[in-house]
């Protein structure tokens, strides 16, 4: 993959536009998000996560994060759910078990999220570029 450099590896098309992520950009997103989950949230290898972002390029990033970190993706009873702000609004569990990931086409963090929840799209920006 590294030989592809700036060539697109992920293309996401929706009614709001088209986003292409190069190998470099995709790897950077995975690295930052991996560091966030491991160092920021202190998730350990084999922890369980649910990626509930639907048809969005962020889904491919977070699935890549699970592979890079050794996390296990599950549908039921995860340690952490990665989901959109709209899902956080109706979340019945503890806010500590839900990370809000923006569904903005360009990945801009949501400006307002429910109290007590982690704004994952904002937090990942504070973590290193290499995992």
Residue ranges and their predicted role:
Residues 18, 23, 55-57:
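Alpha-helical scaffold segments that form or flank carboxylate-/histidine-based iron centers
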Residues 36-71, 76:
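Conserved AMP-binding/adenylate-forming
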Residues 14, 25-26, 51, 81:
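Acidic, surface-exposed loops and disordered segments
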Residues 64, 68-131:
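Structural core segment of the AMP-binding/adenylate-forming
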Residues 11-13, 25-36:
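Conserved N-terminal alpha-helix of the aminotransferase class I/II PLP-enzyme fold
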Residues 7, 44-46, 78, 95:
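A general structural motif
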Residues 1-21, 125, 131:
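AMP-dependent adenylate-forming
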Residues 30, 55, 84-85:
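Helix N-cap/beta->alpha junction signal
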């Amino acid at each position: 993959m590294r030989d592809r450099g700036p060539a697109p590896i992920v293309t996401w098309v929706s009614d709001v536009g088209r986003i292409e992520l190069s190998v470099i950009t995709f790897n950077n997103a995975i690295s930052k998000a991996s560091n966030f989950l491991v160092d920021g949230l202190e998730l350990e290898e084999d922890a369980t996560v649910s990626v509930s972002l639907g048809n969005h390029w962020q889904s491919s990033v977070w699935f890549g994060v699970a592979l890079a970190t050794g996390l296990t993706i599950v549908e039921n009873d995860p340690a952490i759910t990665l989901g959109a702000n709209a899902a956080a609004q109706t979340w019945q569990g503890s806010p500590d078990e839900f990370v809000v990931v923006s569904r903005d086409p360009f990945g801009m963090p949501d400006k307002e999220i429910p109290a007590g929840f982690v704004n994952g799209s904002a937090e990942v920006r504070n973590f290193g570029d290499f995992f």
